[in-house]
């Protein structure tokens, strides 16, 4: 670990905290972050040459595994024609058509560069479309680092213990109404008070930033009904779940149609890509066809579009998800069986190729309060034990894990063998 330690010390002199995204700093689990030099399939290697089975998968994008050959070749080919034009390309058109085909609720699509851009723009659009100010989000759900969304947020904000960030003016935060995930009554109550001024509900249909928490039965359907009743826009933040919990995202898996959808991560094949889209009558309020302004110098970047198209073309092929979901289930079942074997209080959640492990005696974790009351000290011991065994999990107990096409039965078996050793020490 000498090289990672030296790089971390060096990085802290010129990069805040030594990292460019807070959760990477290992602040939640302690110790030195591993500096990665390469990745392939289900594996990554650090600067000291140690190999890891990777369950972060770049925080979700790499559903086909690291260093996927068709994506790599598409990026190389596209880059030979130029890196950025600042003008429309056919690749953008093909990408929008493909996204609309795979996620039919997205009748029109606007490309951006990140998930944060997508959610920020979708909320502005919802406000412009409805001429209302307030938005509803859920405790522990993270939708990027836009000011109005950093109120009781999840992900790195939750890990740092500052779910409502300093630097967000009170007169901005007051328009963000926060309610309990998986609790329809709390949503109904807030609408009874503020319904006439609520522009939208934004929700992760599977909460992936307070670990992995699927919706309880009827929750998403209830949000749809409330938005219909009050004329508010329902936004699904599928930056994490899009093309990961099913080919058509969480909205296909749970059969609930939002008005707007935000995508990121998988859609870029590892490159920085996001998009938002939805009902034609709403999307046409975006400039240049409407008055709601949104723009981006690198939006629709040709190299990024090439990577995304190569990823989605493979994802469209029949049978891909069957094996990924089967292996994810085997992993999660294995964790649970081993924890039971060693008398460890553990519960697990799963949604497609996303999973969560919670050190708790609660039978099923369904909300923010249960998630933050899990045994983080025990998770940290498990985390470092697995890291020592060559298994790279998310360095925070509030982050979901991800399985890719490259995580075959052999990889799962190796992971569970490592977990057996680590559980025996807890």
Swiss-Prot record:
**HAMAP family recorded for this chain?**
HemL_aminotrans_3
Q: Which family does it belong to?
A: Belongs to the class-III pyridoxal-phosphate-dependent aminotransferase family. HemL subfamily.
**From which source organism is this entry?**
Alteromonas mediterranea (strain DSM 17117 / CIP 110805 / LMG 28347 / Deep ecotype)
Top EC class for this record? isomerase
**Subcellular location(s) per record:** Cytoplasm
The catalysed reaction is: (S)-4-amino-5-oxopentanoate = 5-aminolevulinate
The pathway it acts in is:
Porphyrin-containing compound metabolism; protoporphyrin-IX biosynthesis; 5-aminolevulinate from L-glutamyl-tRNA(Glu): step 2/2
This entry carries the following GO cellular component terms, namely: cytoplasm
Cite the entry's keywords alphabetically: Cytoplasm, Isomerase, Porphyrin biosynthesis, Pyridoxal phosphate
Q: Tell me the Pfam families matching this sequence.
A: Aminotran_3
So which cofactors does this thing need? pyridoxal 5'-phosphate
Organism superkingdom: Bacteria
Any one Gene Ontology biological process term?
A: protoporphyrinogen IX biosynthetic process
What Gene Ontology terms describe what this protein does at the molecular function level? glutamate-1-semialdehyde 2,1-aminomutase activity; pyridoxal phosphate binding; transaminase activity
| Name of the molecule in the record | Glutamate-1-semialdehyde 2,1-aminomutase
Spell out which residues are annotated as carrying N6-(pyridoxal phosphate)lysine.
Answer: 265
Give the EC number(s) under which this enzyme is classified: 5.4.3.8
| Main location, first listed in the record | cytoplasm
Gene name in the database record: hemL
InterPro entries in UniProt = 4pyrrol_synth_GluAld_NH2Trfase (IPR004639), Aminotrans_3 (IPR005814), Aminotrans_3_PPA_site (IPR049704), PyrdxlP-dep_Trfase (IPR015424), PyrdxlP-dep_Trfase_major (IPR015421), PyrdxlP-dep_Trfase_small (IPR015422)
Describe its partners and assembly state: Homodimer.
Keyword Nucleotide-binding in record: no
């Amino acid at each position: 670990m000498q090289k990672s330690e030296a790089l971390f010390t060096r990085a802290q002199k010129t990069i805040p905290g030594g990292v460019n995204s807070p959760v990477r700093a290992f602040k939640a689990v302690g110790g030195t972050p591993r500096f990665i030099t390469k990745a392939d399939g289900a594996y990554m290697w650090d600067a000291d040459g140690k190999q890891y089975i990777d369950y972060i998968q770049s925080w979700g994008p790499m559903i086909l595994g690291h260093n996927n050959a068709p994506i790599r070749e598409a990026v190389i080919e596209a880059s030979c024609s130029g890196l950025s034009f600042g003008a429309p390309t056919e690749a953008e058109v093909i990408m929008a058509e493909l996204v609309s085909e795979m996620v039919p609720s997205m009748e029109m699509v606007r490309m951006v560069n990140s998930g944060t851009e997508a959610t920020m723009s979708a909320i502005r659009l919802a406000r412009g479309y409805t001429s209302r100010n307030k938005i509803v989000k859920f405790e522990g759900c993270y939708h990027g680092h836009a000011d109005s969304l950093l109120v009781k947020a999840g992900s790195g904000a939750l890990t740092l213990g500052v779910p409502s960030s300093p630097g967000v003016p009170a007169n901005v935060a007051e328009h963000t109404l926060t309610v309990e995930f998986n609790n329809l009554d709390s949503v109904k109550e807030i609408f009874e008070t503020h319904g006439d001024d609520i522009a939208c509900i934004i929700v992760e249909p599977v909460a992936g930033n307070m670990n992995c928490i699927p919706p309880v039965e009827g929750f998403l359907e209830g949000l749809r009904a409330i938005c219909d009743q009050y004329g508010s826009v329902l936004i699904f933040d599928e930056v994490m779940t899009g093309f990961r919990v099913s080919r058509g995202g969480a909205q296909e898996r749970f059969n609930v149609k939002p008005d707007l959808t935000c995508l990121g991560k998988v859609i870029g094949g590892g490159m920085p890509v996001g998009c938002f889209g939805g009902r034609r009558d709403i999307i046409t309020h975006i400039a240049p066809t409407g008055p709601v302004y949104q723009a981006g110098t690198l939006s629709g970047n040709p190299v990024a579009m090439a990577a995304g198209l190569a990823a989605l073309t493979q994802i469209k092929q029949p049978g891909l998800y069957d094996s990924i979901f089967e292996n994810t289930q085997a992993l999660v079942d294995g964790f649970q069986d081993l924890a039971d074997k060693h008398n460890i209080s553990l519960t697990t959640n799963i949604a497609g190729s996303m999973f969560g492990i919670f050190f708790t005696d609660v039978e099923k974790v369904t909300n923010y309060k249960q998630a933050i009351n899990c045994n983080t000290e025990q998770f940290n011991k498990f985390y470092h034990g697995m890291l020592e065994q060559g298994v790279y999990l998310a360095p925070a107990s509030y982050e979901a894990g991800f399985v890719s096409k490259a995580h075959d039965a052999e990889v799962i078996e190796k992971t569970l063998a490592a977990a057996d050793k680590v559980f025996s020490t807890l």
